[in-house]
Structure formats: structure tokens, C-alpha cells
A protein has these predicted regions:
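Transmembrane helical cores of multi-pass secondary ion antiporters/exchangers
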Residues: 1-412
Length: 412
């Protein structure tokens, strides 16, 4: 096991030294660390048995922290005032992705109950900007598009989670995996409601306390990071103890806290750009190490077919429809629809749901989710840099042409 850990740590150091150069190529961080985890597992340096409990532990920690930090960086007032694209992608595109995905899932898995089909579609709906970093950080892509994709990926995992829990509850009822069906449904709703309530109260009150201590100069920026991470864990544990869902609580707490402090807490952004990256890399290593071997072993044609349809048809169609009526060009709608890579949220949601809720269908959900992550990592990772450059150049030409046409019309 020590040799495996040595390889992992050496790989992290090597990637960190080459990160700037690699960011301009088709090689992405998720691709590298997913591959390293898989290779170490296959070579026998770290066995899956050794990593089994670690997978769940890191999954829970990663999901709690990332949900909180993603939500805390979203300015709700600015989101309302500025570009409507991300709002439409979230409020129209996300439900459409789940609806269309459910329909296509039936074609591949007709024997499954409808709630199971909807659950799989909901788990594949969230996107991960980390897999398309070459797009959101490429300045040749217009700012509107980059911001829209970043905001959408920051919020859609938290918005999809209540839907995932709802369908998971129905699956438990339909498959008889719970003795008291009504109590299980009530439990599902209480998880969502209490999670939202606790998260909102914890996030808002902590934000106000943070601003008060800052105004009275009784705190220090040195310790604000410790306080924020403690709040993240507190919101999760408090909701869990009160019978709510800790992940929903962490997301709502981040949203409430970030909009209360309104940019005063620099740690939120600094952690995401530094230590947060390490957390993301570790999660991909763990997925490659403990989950990917089994997922590939159980990959079937229906599973692969549904994943490809989800990547190339379901999300692009949903986003295209959600942007109808805006000033977005057809090329922009297609581009933003394609760049919805499935990443950590998909893997971690499936892992936690399969462990705690689903029973007999848990394995199937996990197989689809993990295979979706590695396939999306390759497809979107390879396409990100070249397509971002191509789109940036193409949209620039289209804008020049549209301005010229406008001038000609004005002259007439």
C-alpha cells in the first residue's frame, strides 16, 4: 500500500509542476487522477478492500465541502439582475434534462420502475465545471458563456439533490425495500424540509455573526477559513441530528452564508482555488481506485448507450430548449448544451444513495454513474480546449457579421 501512496503523491507533485502547460492541452486534472487511481488499483499496489471505507468517507467530506463552497460563491441578487441564461438553464434546463433523460432511460431499461428511470436521469443531470476547466477559463470564449456555465454547475448539484432524494424514496416504496412505505415517503420529505430549514438558519446567522465580528475587529482573517469549514461540518451534522439531510443543509447554508457576507469572506474563493483543488483531485483518485474497476467490469451496451445519449442528446436538447427566446445564437445553445460534463456530484450522489437508500437497485445506479463520469471525463476533457478555441473564433466571426448586417440595414 505504501508504494501505491508514493505513486499517488509523486503524481500530484508532477501534475502541479506541469499544470499550466497541461491546461492548454487535452489532458485535464480529472482525467489524470481518475486514471492514476485506476492504474494503481489494477497494478495491485492498493486493493479495493483497503479503499472501501475510505471511498465513503472522502465522498461524504468532499460532497459536503464542495456543495457549501459552490453555493457560497453564487450572488443571488446579481444572478437576478444580470444575464438570464444560467437561470433559464437551471429552472427550465435542469427539469427538462431529468424529464427527457427519464424518457430515454425507458428505451434502454424498460424493465425498471419509472421512479428508478427518473432517479438515474436526475443523478446524471448535475454538471461539473472542473471537467471543462479549459472552457470556463478560456478567454477566447465570451464572458457571458463562461459565467453561465460556471453559475449553472455551481447550483445545479444542490438543486438536483432534493429531486434525487424524492425519487430514491419512491424507488424504496415501489421495490418494497422498506417495510412501511408511507413512513419512508414522510422521511424523504422531512429530510428535504429540515435540511433546507437548518441550512438557511445556520448559514444566515453565521454570516451575520461573521460580519459583526469583522466590524468590531474581534476576529482575524487568519482564522476565517477554520470558521467556514467548521460551519460546513456543523450545518451537515446539525441537520442530520434533527432528522434532515446534511447535504441539502450544507448547500443551503453555503447559499445563505455567501449572500450574507457578500464577498467579505475571501477564504471561500481562496480555498476553492487551492485546497479545494486537492480535495477534487483526491476524490477522482478515490473514484478511480475504489469504484472504476467494478464499474468497467459491469459496463454493458445499454448502460454505455444511455450514457452517450445523455451526453450528446439529453442535456444539449434540454439546454437548447431552455435558451429559446433569448439572444443566444444557435451555435451558443449547442455549445453550452454539450459542455455539461458529469463529474463529482454524479459519482458522489450515486455512491451515497446506493449505500444508504436504494437496496437492490443501488448497484445499477452506481455502475451507470461511475461509467458516466469516466466517459464524460474523456469526452469533455479531450474536447474542452480545442472546442473552446474553435467556438471563440467562430462566435467572434458571427458577431462581426451580425454587426455589419446591422450597419447595412441602418444605411438603408
Amino acid at each position: 500500500m505504501e508504494i501505491g501512496l508514493l505513486i499517488l503523491l509523486f503524481s500530484v507533485s508532477a501534475y502541479a509542476m506541469l499544470a499550466k502547460k497541461l491546461s492548454t492541452t487535452i489532458i485535464t486534472a480529472p482525467m489524470v487522477f481518475l486514471g492514476i487511481g485506476f492504474a494503481v488499483s489494477q497494478l495491485g499496489f492498493i486493493s479495493i478492500g483497503d479503499a472501501h471505507e475510505t471511498v465513503y468517507l472522502i465522498a461524504e467530506i468532499s460532497l459536503v465541502v464542495l456543495l457549501f463552497l459552490d453555493a457560497s460563491q453564487i450572488n443571488l441578487r446579481r444572478l437576478k439582475r444580470q444575464n438570464t441564461w444560467p437561470l433559464r438553464m437551471l429552472l427550465i434546463g435542469l427539469p427538462l434534462s431529468i424529464l427527457i433523460g427519464t424518457g430515454f432511460a425507458y428505451l434502454f431499461f424498460p424493465q425498471w420502475p419509472w421512479a428508478m428511470l427518473a432517479l438515474v436521469a436526475a443523478i446524471l443531470a448535475p454538471t461539473d465545471a472542473a471537467l471543462g476547466q479549459a472552457v470556463v477559463s478560456n478567454e477566447s470564449v465570451p464572458l457571458n458563456e463562461r459565467q453561465s456555465l460556471s453559475v449553472e454547475s455551481g447550483l445545479n448539484d444542490g438543486l438536483a439533490l432534493p429531486v434525487i432524494l424524492f425519487f430514491a424514496s419512491i424507488v424504496a416504496m415501489e421495490t418494497g425495500s422498506q417495510e412501511n412505505e408511507m413512513s419512508w415517503l414522510v422521511f424523504g420529505f422531512s429530510q428535504i424540509f429540515i435540511g433546507i430549514l437548518v441550512g438557511a438558519l445556520m448559514g444566515y446567522s453565521s454570516g451575520r455573526l461573521f460580519l459583526y465580528s469583522e466590524s468590531k475587529k474581534i476576529s482575524s482573517t487568519i482564522y476565517e477559513g477554520i470558521g467556514v469549514l467548521a460551519l460546513t461540518g456543523t450545518s451537515y451534522l446539525m441537520a442530520t441530528l434533527m432528522g434532515g439531510n446534511g447535504f441539502i443543509s450544507a448547500f443551503v447554508a453555503g447559499l445563505a452564508f455567501g449572500n450574507s457576507v457578500k464577498g467579505h469572506c475571501r477564504f471561500i474563493y481562496q480555498f476553492t482555488e487551492s485546497e479545494g483543488q486537492m480535495l477534487i483531485w483526491s476524490s477522482f483518485v478515490i473514484i478511480g481506485l475504489g469504484l472504476l474497476p467494478s464499474a468497467i467490469e459491469h459496463l454493458t451496451f445499454p448502460v454505455a448507450g444511455y450514457i452517450l445519449v445523455s451526453i450528446f442528446i439529453v442535456r444539449p436538447l434540454a439546454i437548447y430548449l431552455s435558451l429559446i427566446g433569448t439572444k443566444a445564437k444557435t451555435l451558443t445553445k449547442v455549445f453550452m448544451g454539450f459542455f455539461g460534463p458529469r463529474g463529482l456530484a454524479t459519482a458522489l450522489f450515486a455512491l451515497i444513495i446506493s449505500k444508504d437508500i436504494l437496496g437492490q437497485y443501488g448497484h445499477s445506479v452506481l455502475i451507470i454513474a461511475i461509467n458516466a463520469v469516466w466517459m464524460s471525463t474523456l469526452i469533455h476533457g479531450i474536447a474542452a480546449a480545442p472546442m473552446a478555441n474553435w467556438y471563440g473564433a467562430k462566435i467572434k466571426v458571427l458577431k462581426i457579421k451580425s454587426r455589419e448586417l446591422a450597419r447595412l440595414k441602418n444605411r438603408k
